[in-house]
Amino acid sequence: MRLMNFAVLAIGLGACTGAPEPPDRIAYLAIGGSDAAGVGADPLTDGYVFRIAEELDEQVDEVSLTPLAIPRADTGQLDAAVELLLETGIEPDLVTVWTGANDVIEGEDVDDFEDELEDLFARLRERTDGVIVAANIPDLTELPRFREDPDDDVTRERIEAFNDAIEEQAADYDVLLVDLSDEPVEDELVSDEDGFHPNDKGHQRIAEEFLEVILPALGLEPEA
């Protein structure tokens, strides 16, 4: 696997019918916050993005990974970073997007979030007709961090509204959806250090959820 650490900033289809033809090469762009950088995993390269790339590498001759991972970034900041990255001429075959949690925590208005997400999806879709996969937001209120110290901005009602926005924009831009909203938030999947980020097991679970959507979309075999 050829790894392009272009943007891990320390601050981080085939035919219209039937299965798509499996690719020989995949240019993979992973967009997200600290989770996409592997925070919570030990080492960071055991994070969910890298686990996805490793599984792809088992089935494809060449996988080039460009992680655009910016800790604490909201969706507007990620969109701005994607705009700059796309100016380099990158043409991804696969894009994963996991954003929204930071927007919820920061108290952003859901309509503003949806506008920013639409800009992001539109920008990506303008560049690639490849596979774009986005995850929604799990129930943050069940994380140890927010059980112990509740936040008025982190409510089930707001999370549901943000997830509705993600679902609507994903449908509009032919983005496949990974539904994490119904996944139980188990303490054994969460880092003991901050009660927020996924630990090794959590990153593995997230990778598995993404791969359930990614592999068939690329015409690849399910995980063994």
In which residue ranges do the predicted regions lie?
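Serine-esterase "nucleophile elbow" of acetyl-processing enzymes
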Residues: 17-71, 84-88
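C-terminal motif of bacterial Sec signal peptides marking the signal peptidase cleavage site
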Residues: 13-15
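Cell-envelope and extracellular/periplasmic
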Residues: 69-73, 99-100
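Alpha-helical cap/lid subdomain in secreted, periplasmic
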Residues: 81-223
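Sec-dependent signal peptide recognition
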Residues: 1-9
